[in-house]
Amino acid sequence: MTSHKAKILLIYTGGTIGMVKDFETGALKAFDFKELLNRIPELHLLDCSIETISFETPIDSSNMNISNWQKMAQLIEENYSKFDGFVVLHGSDTMSYSASALSFMLENLAKPVIFTGSQLPIGDLRTDAKENLITAIQVASLQSNKKPVIQEVCLYFEYKLYRGNRTTKISAEHFNAFTSPNFPELAESGVHLKVNKDLILVSKSAKKLKVHTEFDDNVAILKLFPGINENVLTAIFAIPNLKGIVLE
């Protein structure tokens, strides 16, 4: 009996990982992900098949917004029955926000959605893009008893797999750009890929994937600190149509 070979959909939204250097001009240009397997032959060693899809216009992650989250969720919903896992390539600046958003948008998720990116472009000599991409795909393709090992939205970066909605970016200069302050990593990549099976979410529901796309942006975040001016509070509470405030 042959084992089931996982099918992974690679979704490119934008970000440094999708750029290569034009050595004639020195400028960065978008990478053609249709040539992915040719540019990264190591992917042939993975026990999975890979297909790619890209946003028509790659997004600078600093410009990420609700409509982009809706598009990501829609792509996953449209392809959910065709693939065993999803890897989302994303700029690092707002990756934690997108991973967190999708973790709440994808109800009854029973397959991996792994966000990853890089600090250096994929064509750079010292790039971290190859390791992040290869291992993110490997994590997404992990299976046990013909079911995905990872069944939630995660973020993989610099040898560590995190729960997506527990991450925060801590560095724009170092390869270990993310951390999860209040929850341990779900897996770590070294000589071996070690998954903490006591921490990963396992879907116990037989319900179909339900995608929530409705957002309300009439919400503010207020960071409290000793001595905060009363006028600041008054101004925020007076914002027209404000429906909620998240206090930090």
Please name every model-derived segment.
Residues M1-E78:
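ATP/NTP phosphate-donor binding region
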Residues M1-H4, M105-N108, I114, Q143-V149, ...:
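Solvent-exposed alpha-helices and their adjacent loops that cap or buttress functional pockets
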Residues H4-K5, I11, G15, K21, ...:
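Accessory alpha-helical/coil subdomains and C-terminal extensions
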Residues I11-T13, V88-H90, I114-G117, Q151-E158, ...:
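Short beta-strand segments
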Residues M19-V20, T94-A99, A129-L133:
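Short glycine/serine/threonine-rich phosphate/pyrophosphate-binding segments
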Residues F83-M95, P240-E248:
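Short acidic, glycine-rich surface-loop motifs adjacent to enzyme active sites
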Residues V88-K111:
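Short Gly/Thr/Asp-enriched flexible loops that form oxyanion-binding sites at enzyme active sites
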Residues F115-G190:
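Internal gly/pro-rich beta-alpha loop/helix module
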